[in-house]
Amino acid sequence: MQQKNKYIRIQEFLKQNKFPDFRMNQIKNAVFQGRINHFNEITVLPKSLRKLLIEEFGESILNIAPLKVQHSEQVTKVLFEISGDEKIETVNMKYKAGWESFCISSQCGCHFGCKFCATGDIGLKRNLTSDEMTDQILYFHLKGHSIDSISFMGMGEALANVQVFDALHVLTNPELFALSPRRLSISTIGIIPGIKKITQDYPQVNLTFSLHSPFNEQRSKLMPINERYPLLEVMDTLDEHIRVTSRKVYIAYIMLPGVNDSIDHANEVVNLLRSRYKRGNLFHVNIIRYNPTVSSPMRFEEVNEKQVVNFYKKLKSAGINVTVRSQFGIDIDAACGQLYGNYQKNKNQ
């Protein structure tokens, strides 16, 4: 059974105790306009109500606890403790233009076992609740950060957790975080039912598909989910998403040295995408340099920059929209595929 988010529970609590509707509005305004975290500091509420709220929900609105904060150039990574003594990580990236982007986790661990990912190596501990996902953003909001964009690209597979859709509702609710759906991004390894639900319920949310190999057999070895949802079936689902939404789909491609960075791979990516451009030039490849991890199932060599450039040029010359993604936070294990791996390794020693 899906757990109701805290904002619904607070509203129901107020109604059950016969408080007027405007009290909920006062709480929302205190949190999202005044950046107030503790019920006792919402002084527009009667003291008696504050006492009842604390007894029912605890002292603070935020229900996850920051344990460790690490800083690197343009990047902050926070390790949070959630219920059950489990841990998750969130990354804040600050761009030189002033834009702030947040990479949040949707699961504690991940059971899909992609061979290049530290998070997948620890297995799935549990799905996060809607509150645990949105609280990662609330933490930064309460500290005065500008919430410019959010990616569900942290720990876990977002579309394997049904609570993600309630989190999207909370984040886009005009009375709560009030974010435009176009400032939100969902990354998936290819969970077809989840992609279809995004198409139907959140067509303006950005969608990223983790490809990492255009060859079906190799992709199955790197990403076992390909056995359940084969590449071409996923691509057909993405075609339908584009047809319905007229929105761009991003293709993430991690360059694994000596594994998937050859010109043959580049040519096959071109073949995979170019035939689909009849619906518009709406696939965009993001090339991601492999980030070394302490505990991924397979080890890979350092990225060959020449191969990255050659791969990029091959796609570009074929008319494919392509970008080489900038790297942030590698030194604090905050980059793609690194989250939680180093903490888990240290914990087990």
From Swiss-Prot:
GO terms for biological process: response to antibiotic; rRNA base methylation; tRNA methylation. Its cofactor is [4Fe-4S] cluster. Keywords: 4Fe-4S, Antibiotic resistance, Cytoplasm, Disulfide bond, Iron, Iron-sulfur, Metal-binding, Methyltransferase, rRNA processing, S-adenosyl-L-methionine, Transferase. Binds 1 [4Fe-4S] cluster. The cluster is coordinated with 3 cysteines and an exchangeable S-adenosyl-L-methionine. GO terms for molecular function: 4 iron, 4 sulfur cluster binding; metal ion binding; rRNA (adenine) methyltransferase activity; rRNA binding. The active site is at 89 (proton acceptor), 336 (s-methylcysteine intermediate). The keyword Secreted does not apply. NCBIfam families: CfrAB, PRK14453.1, rSAM_Cfr. HAMAP family: 23SrRNA_methyltr_Cfr. Belongs to the radical SAM superfamily. RlmN family. Cfr subfamily. This is Ribosomal RNA large subunit methyltransferase Cfr.
